[in-house]
From Swiss-Prot:
Region (Disordered) residue spans: 1-226
Keyword Ribosomal protein: no
Subcellular location as annotated: Cell membrane; Cell projection, Growth cone
GO annotation (BP), single: supramolecular fiber organization
The protein's name: Brain acid soluble protein 1
Residues the record lists as Phosphoserine modifications: 40, 92, 128, 131, 160, 167, 169, 173, 192, 218
GO cellular component: cell junction; chromatin; COP9 signalosome; cytoplasm; growth cone; nuclear matrix; nuclear speck; nucleus
Residues bearing a lipid moiety (N-myristoyl glycine): 2
Biased composition (Basic and acidic residues): 15-27, 49-94
Annotated organism of origin: Mus musculus (Mouse)
UniProt KW Membrane keyword: yes
Modified residues (Phosphothreonine): 31, 36
Name of the gene: Basp1
Membrane topology: Lipid-anchor
């Protein structure tokens, strides 16, 4: 019996030791678990502070970036303002250079009418010269006709014929005068006005030529009657 009891006691002891070891291990694990949270708490606090510092630095960097961007924009605006006045004087200079170029055109236009008027004046002069030439040509023809008729007619009749001839020659010589007066008016008038007197002068010459012809025919009729 005693042996059994001893075994039981020993078994109890063994169990007790095992239980004690288990308890110790459990307590150690508990202490370790308790210690790790305590150690992790400072680390978490340190991490939180680092995060806060990083977040604070980021806004600072962002603010610095915004300030730099604003400065760049201000510089760009100032540069644009400086370039704009420079461009405006250049444009004004270009416009001033372009404006004087058309100026010679009116001068040329003003000079053009001068030669045109000069050309018109010679035209008018030529027309008047033609009219006077026609009148002069008609006058010699009248003179020749009178010379041929004078020998055939008697002396008094020749005198009477010469008197109308003189009267006929006077209008012919007096008529070219208005044409000479018309020349300055034609030089001052435009081309259309200058062209108008030109046909008028030959028209005036035609009546002059017709008048001597009529005078010559009347003289011939008088000579035939005689």
């Amino acid at each position: 019996m005693g042996g059994k009891l001893s075994k039981k006691k020993k078994g109890y002891n063994v169990n007790d030791e095992k239980a004690k070891d288990k308890d110790k291990k459990a307590e150690g694990a508990g202490t370790e678990e308790e210690g790790t949270p305590k150690e992790s708490e400072p680390q978490a606090a340190a991490d939180a502070t680092e995060v806060k510092e990083s977040t604070e630095e980021k806004p600072k960097d962002a603010a610095d970036g915004e300030a730099k961007a604003e400065e760049k924009e201000a510089d760009k605006a100032a540069a644009a303002k400086e370039e704009a006045p420079k461009a405006e004087p250049e444009k004004s200079e270009g416009a001033a250079e372009e404006q004087p170029e058309p100026a010679p055109a009116p001068e040329q236009e003003a000079a053009a009418p001068g030669p045109a008027a000069g050309g018109e004046a010679p035209k008018a002069g030529e027309a008047s010269a033609e009219s006077t030439g026609a009148a002069d040509g008609a006058a010699p023809e009248e003179g020749e006709a009178k010379k041929t008729e004078a020998p055939a007619a008697a002396g008094p009749e020749a005198k009477s014929d010469a008197a109308p001839a003189a009267s006929d020659s006077k209008p012919s010589s007096a008529e070219p005068a208005p044409s000479s007066k018309e020349t300055p008016a034609a030089s001052e008038a435009p081309s259309s006005a200058a062209k108008a007197p030109a046909p008028a002068a030959p028209a005036a010459a035609e009546p002059q030529a017709e008048a001597p012809a009529a005078a010559a025919s009347s003289e011939q009729s008088v000579a035939v009657k005689e």
